[in-house]
C-alpha cells in the first residue's frame, strides 16, 4: 500500500469538531477511491459505498426527497446488508459524485442532520460542459480537498526511503551543506526513475513490483487515453478539438528551453484568445497544474 500525504489531512478533517461533508477532487486514477476506502476501513466501524459512474442506477436514490431518513432507507434497499447506518460510526462514500449533482446537493442535508460522515470523490468537478448546475453546490456545507499523483517524497516512501533519510537530505539542502556521496547518487537515481515513472499509483506500483518500464509505459498510455476519452465525452462539442490540441501540445511545451506556454505550438498562428479557455478546461480536469514564474533550482545539489 502506498503511503500518501493526504492521509494526515483526512484524519485532521475527521477529528475536527462539527466538520462538513468532504469532497476529494483530483484527476482520474490519482488514488482517490483507494485512499478513501482505506481511510474509511481504518477509522469507521461501518462504510456505505456508492459509485455513481459504475452503478448509474443509484442516482435514482437522490432523485426525490433529500431527507436523510429517506435517503438511508433507499440506500439500504439498494445495497441490502452492505448498508449499516449507525450514528457517528458510519461513513458514507459517494464515489464519482460529479455524475450525480443531486447527491452533491444532499451534502447540505447530511451536514445539517449530523449523524453520518460523508466523503465524496470527483474527478471532473466544475469543468465547463459537464453537469453544470451551480445551484447543486451546497456552498458553506462542504469541505473540498484536492488530491494529486504521488510527489517525489511520496515516491521515495514507496521505494523504502525512510523519514530519517529524507530529513537528512532536506537538512543538507536547507543548510547548503554537501549531501553525502552515496545518498546523492541514490537520490539522483530515484529522481530519474520518478521522471520516467511519474506519480500515478498504478504506474508506481507496477514499477516497484516488476521494475519493467514497458509495463509502466502501457499503464501511462492507458491513463492518457482515458483523459482523451473524457475530453470527447464531457466537453462541449465546439471545444473538443481545441482541448485535445492543447493537451497534445504539452510534451512540446515542456521539451523546449523556454518553459512559458506558447499557444503557437498548439497550431501555427494560435492565440490565447482562441485557446485559453481550452487550456483552462485541461487544468480544471486536474490533468495539468500551472507553474507561475518558475525559478531554476539547478544550483541545489540534489
Walk through the language-model features, giving the residues of each:
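Short regulatory helix/loop adjacent to the ATP-binding pocket of P-loop NTPases
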Residues: 127-142
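Pre-Walker A adenine-sensing motif
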Residues: 3-15
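Short glycine-rich substrate-engagement loop in P-loop NTPases that contacts/grips substrate
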Residues: 57-84
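Accessory nucleic acid-recognition modules appended to NTPase machines
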Residues: 209-300
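Structural recognition of the conserved hydrophobic beta-strand(s) that form the central parallel beta-sheet
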Residues: 117-123
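Hydrophobic anchor at the beta1->P-loop junction of P-loop NTPases
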Residues: 24
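Conserved lysine of the Walker
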Residues: 32
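Hydrophobic positions on the alpha1 helix immediately C-terminal to the Walker A/P-loop
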Residues: 35
Amino acid at each position: 500500500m502506498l503511503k500518501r500525504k493526504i492521509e494526515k489531512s483526512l484524519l485532521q478533517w475527521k477529528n475536527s469538531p462539527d466538520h462538513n461533508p468532504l469532497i476529494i477532487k483530483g484527476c482520474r486514477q490519482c488514488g482517490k477511491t483507494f485512499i478513501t476506502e482505506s481511510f474509511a476501513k481504518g477509522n469507521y466501524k461501518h462504510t456505505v459505498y456508492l459509485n455513481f459512474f459504475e452503478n448509474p442506477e443509484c442516482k435514482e436514490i437522490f432523485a426525490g426527497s433529500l431527507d436523510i431518513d429517506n435517503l438511508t432507507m433507499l440506500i439500504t434497499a439498494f445495497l441490502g446488508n452492505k448498508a449499516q447506518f449507525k450514528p457517528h460510526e458510519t461513513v458514507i462514500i459517494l464515489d464519482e459524485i460529479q455524475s450525480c449533482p443531486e447527491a452533491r446537493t444532499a451534502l447540505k442535508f447530511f451536514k445539517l442532520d449530523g449523524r453520518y460522515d460523508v466523503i465524496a470523490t470527483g474527478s471532473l468537478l466544475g469543468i465547463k460542459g459537464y453537469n453544470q448546475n451551480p445551484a447543486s453546490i451546497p456552498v458553506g456545507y462542504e469541505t473540498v480537498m484536492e488530491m494529486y499523483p504521488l510527489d517525489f517524497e511520496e515516491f521515495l516512501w514507496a521505494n523504502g526511503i525512510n523519514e530519517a533519510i529524507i530529513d537528512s537530505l532536506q537538512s543538507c539542502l536547507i543548510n547548503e551543506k554537501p549531501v553525502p556521496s552515496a545518498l546523492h547518487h541514490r537520490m539522483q537515481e530515484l529522481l530519474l526513475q520518478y521522471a520516467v515513472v511519474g506519480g500515478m499509483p498504478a504506474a508506481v506500483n507496477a514499477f516497484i513490483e516488476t521494475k519493467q518500464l514497458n509495463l509502466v509505459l502501457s499503464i501511462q498510455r492507458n491513463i492518457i487515453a482515458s483523459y482523451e476519452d473524457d475530453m470527447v465525452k464531457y466537453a462541449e462539442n465546439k471545444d473538443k478539438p481545441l482541448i485535445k490540441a492543447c493537451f497534445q501540445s504539452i510534451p512540446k511545451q515542456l521539451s523546449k528551453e523556454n518553459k512559458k506556454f506558447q499557444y503557437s505550438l498548439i497550431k501555427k498562428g494560435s492565440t490565447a484568445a482562441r485557446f485559453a479557455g481550452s487550456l483552462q478546461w485541461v487544468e480544471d480536469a486536474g490533468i495539468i497544474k500551472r507553474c507561475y514564474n518558475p525559478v531554476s533550482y539547478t544550483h541545489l545539489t540534489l
